[in-house]
């Protein structure tokens, strides 16, 4: 036993051993990512460097970092060597962009398979597939609204970093993308919502296919997400952000208050969202 252990130590101390161990960690345990855009502001910030747990939702089929070349075949056909439970509602998730698997996104899982989503001006609604009794038992009554005889939950997640930008009318931009055939949600009229001038509809609707996930950025009006390009299949799920190991602001100063913080801490404690709001930012009208 001691002899085998010594051989392992010798191997791990070699260049080959170091590379193999690092790749195994990246393939199966954790991988580093950098937040490149403001779509999750004020929860995750541009310049946050994260470690992502690769085993949060099963074990993904390993790929060479940056090149995204598969090391092994996709034996199960669902992008995972070992299946696991998929993302829960409200989870922050790292996944591959469905239209380009070399691009990674990080968003919040707004809805799971079978759920219904309504998006209108400055508000979003969720109908969990479990139905009315589940909604009444799991959400505060003041958030529950009824559309066409079905209960929905208005803004079901209370994380302090979730925000809308009063300077931006994303609904108008959604119309542009809809007319260009680049918007995934369907226009609908919802009687209980305010009418929008000159339009035959006042909201957008989407029902999430089974075993897929509807991903939305916390920075609602600056997020290119499932509202535009549809839901995310389980095969594209990479993992769950774990903790911030480094963070730089726009002036290349280290955000010491974020370094070493677990994502669960950052997303749940209001002081982190407030400090993020206190930073100087200029989103303009970008959708990222």
What do these predicted regions represent?
Residues 2-9, 28, 45-288:
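Soluble "head" domains of membrane/secretory-pathway proteins
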Residues 10-30:
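Hydrophobic membrane-insertion alpha-helices, especially the h-region
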Residues 14, 37-39, 223:
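Short linear Ser/Thr-Pro motifs
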Residues 31-48:
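Alpha-helical transmembrane signal-anchor/signal-peptide segments
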């Amino acid at each position: 036993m001691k002899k085998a252990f010594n051989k392992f130590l010798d191997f791990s101390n070699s260049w080959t051993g170091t590379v193999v161990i690092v790749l195994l960690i990246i393939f199966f345990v954790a991988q580093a990512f950098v937040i490149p855009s403001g779509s999750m502001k004020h929860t995750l910030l541009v310049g946050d460097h994260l470690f992502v747990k690769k085993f949060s939702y099963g074990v993904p089929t390993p790929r060479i970092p940056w090149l995204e070349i598969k090391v092994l075949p996709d034996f199960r056909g669902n992008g995972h060597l070992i299946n696991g439970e998929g993302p829960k509602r409200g989870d922050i998730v790292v996944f591959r962009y469905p239209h380009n698997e070399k691009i990674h996104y990080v968003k919040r899982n707004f809805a799971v398979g079978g759920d219904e989503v309504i998006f209108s001006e400055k508000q979003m609604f969720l109908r969990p597939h479990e139905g009315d009794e589940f909604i009444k038992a799991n959400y505060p009554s003041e958030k529950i609204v009824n559309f066409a005889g079905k209960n929905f939950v208005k803004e079901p997640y209370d994380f302090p970093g979730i925000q809308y930008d009063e300077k931006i009318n994303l609904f108008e931009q959604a119309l542009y993308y809809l007319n260009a055939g680049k918007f995934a949600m369907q226009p609908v009229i919802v009687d209980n919502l305010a009418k929008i001038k000159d339009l035959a509809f006042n909201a957008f609707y989407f029902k999430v296919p089974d075993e897929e996930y509807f991903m939305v950025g916390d920075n609602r009006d600056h997020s290119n997400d499932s509202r535009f390009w549809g839901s995310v299949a389980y095969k594209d799920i990479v993992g769950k952000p774990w903790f911030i190991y480094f963070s730089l602001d726009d002036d290349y100063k280290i955000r010491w208050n974020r370094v070493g913080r677990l994502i669960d801490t950052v997303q749940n404690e209001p002081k982190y969202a407030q400090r993020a709001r206190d930073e100087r930012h200029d989103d303009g009208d970008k959708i990222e």
